[in-house]
Amino acid sequence: GATYDVAMRFLHEDPWVRLDLLREAMPNQNIQMLLRGRNTVGYTPYPDSVCRGFVQEAAKSGVDVFRIFDALNDVSQMRPAIDAVLETNTTVAEVAMAYSGDLASPKENLYTLDYYLKLAEQIVESGAHILAIKDMAGLLRPEAASKLVMALRKEFDLPVHVHTHDTAGG
């Protein structure tokens, strides 16, 4: 998500040139990027036309897979990016659920398995090619991961990817 910002602000590089150089150096590798839904790689929501134009340019420059998410799991905020990726007819929409809470805990009453299954249904209906779990805070414990992945695989006929962090070191 912050790749473009970091390239410009800290490395003083053109992110589009950087992407072209990466594609040239790795011609037979899939290149994936993170899109913050309607915010693309920025920090504010953009009009659909800007989102579409960004995705078209990124695809032309060699991005193959777009992992699309919204920090609040608002599929309507992801929709412009999903639609833009689908319109390319050449790239993959990996749409991610931002994981929070602990669905394996009996005390959890918001981020439950049912919550994630309903969210996944919206994501699948949006046209996603891949369903992803984005555990950016490192909260996804093995028991919860097992329950969630098994339920998603049982319910939906899409590949399921898990992206997690272990920032606490546990």
Which positions does each model-derived feature cover?
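Alpha/beta enzyme core
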Residues: 1-4, 11-31, 36, 40-162, ...
